[in-house]
């Protein structure tokens, strides 16, 4: 504990998480609601990973990226939801200093990884639709493996910088985090030391990790739309668009909820509003992604039917 708090002269050993709501009558309903969300999230994302692994016709870069996205969503929800569930059952939801920093680190890692995974998926769709004859060369095993590895490596680097400087931040007088998990801004609100460098890092990485993926996605879809419009057959246009529709939905939900959570003006963004919008970003989005891809993706639906039919005859 002391090692992790090196440089923190006012040694803090634990924090208190305020939780999502202080109303006693809401604790049990909220516990049941988020337990259900977590179970659906686990079943959906682990099910998607298993389905892709068992279905040979889904062994393509597109679905390997989807499998990686499901892994990220599963991990992201596991980092946040279990501790939130504890807050509904206890009056004082205590989290140790080291556990808080670990939660912050993994939350940032998987959040950043999701940004770049969605960008990589957009690039994959661009290659498949705009350069189909070169797809197997452009998206070879080495290429998409490098993209997936690069996503995680870069996410680890970014989160390490932010968490590392948070470890150097002093917390002397306040130890109640007005949130249901350890996030950057609620922790900085408790800091008793100068947080200028932390704020610069947050601004830099937030801009970088928003601008680069969004620019990649927008550029990819501009070329995709131009290519789709040049297709003469109506059936060809529909087929090309249908391969992108699920990804567009996932991107819209993820970035829409993220923007609503983190980009509101401070004058409009009370802590209560921040908690509510964070709930959607951290718990609902990981639950929705596998549902979107299973309900709206024809290949996934066919693979699921085959698996279920195989089970019937066993």
Swiss-Prot record:
Chief site of localization: membrane
Extracellular side stretches: 1-31, 90-100, 168-184, 232-247
Pfam families: 7tm_4
Places the protein is found: Cell membrane
Transmembrane portions of the chain: 32-52, 69-89, 101-121, 147-167, 185-205, 211-231, 248-268
Molecular function per GO: G protein-coupled receptor activity; olfactory receptor activity
One cellular-component annotation, GO: plasma membrane
InterPro entries hit by this protein: GPCR_Rhodpsn, GPCR_Rhodpsn_7TM, Olfact_rcpt
Tagged with keyword Cytoplasm: no
Membrane-protein topology: Multi-pass membrane protein
Ranges per topology, Cytoplasmic: 53-68, 122-146, 206-210, 269-314
Stored PANTHER family: OLFACTORY RECEPTOR
Protein name: Olfactory receptor 8G18
The species this protein was found in: Mus musculus
């Amino acid at each position: 504990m002391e090692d992790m708090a090196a440089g923190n002269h006012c040694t803090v050993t634990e924090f208190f998480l305020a939780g999502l709501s202080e109303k006693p009558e809401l604790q049990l309903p909220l516990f049941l609601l988020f337990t259900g969300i977590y179970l659906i999230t686990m079943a959906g994302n682990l099910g998607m990973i298993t389905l892709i692994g068992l279905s040979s016709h889904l062994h393509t870069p597109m679905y390997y990226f989807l499998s990686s996205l499901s892994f990220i969503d599963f991990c992201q929800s596991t980092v946040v939801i279990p501790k939130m569930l504890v807050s509904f059952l206890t009056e004082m939801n205590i989290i140790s200093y080291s556990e808080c920093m670990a939660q912050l680190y993994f939350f940032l890692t998987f959040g950043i990884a999701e940004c770049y995974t969605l960008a990589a998926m957009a690039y994959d769709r661009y290659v498949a639709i705009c350069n189909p004859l070169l797809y197997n060369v452009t998206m070879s095993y080495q290429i998409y493996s490098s993209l997936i590895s690069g996503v995680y490596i870069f996410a680890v680097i970014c989160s390490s910088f932010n968490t590392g400087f948070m470890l150097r931040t002093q917390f002397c007088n306040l130890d109640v985090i007005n949130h249901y998990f350890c996030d950057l801004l609620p922790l900085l609100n408790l800091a008793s030391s100068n947080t200028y460098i932390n704020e610069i890092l947050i601004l830099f990485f937030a801009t970088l990790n928003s601008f680069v993926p969004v620019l990649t996605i927008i550029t990819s879809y501009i070329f995709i739309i131009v290519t789709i419009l040049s297709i003469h057959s109506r059936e060809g246009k529909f087929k090309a668009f249908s391969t992108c529709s699920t990804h567009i939905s996932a991107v819209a939900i993820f970035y829409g909820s993220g923007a609503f959570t983190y980009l509101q003006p401070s004058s409009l963004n009370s802590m209560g509003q921040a908690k509510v919008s964070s709930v959607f970003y951290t718990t609902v989005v990981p639950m929705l992604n596998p549902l979107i891809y299973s309900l709206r993706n024809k290949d996934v639906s066919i693979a699921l039917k085959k698996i279920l039919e195989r089970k019937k005859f066993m």
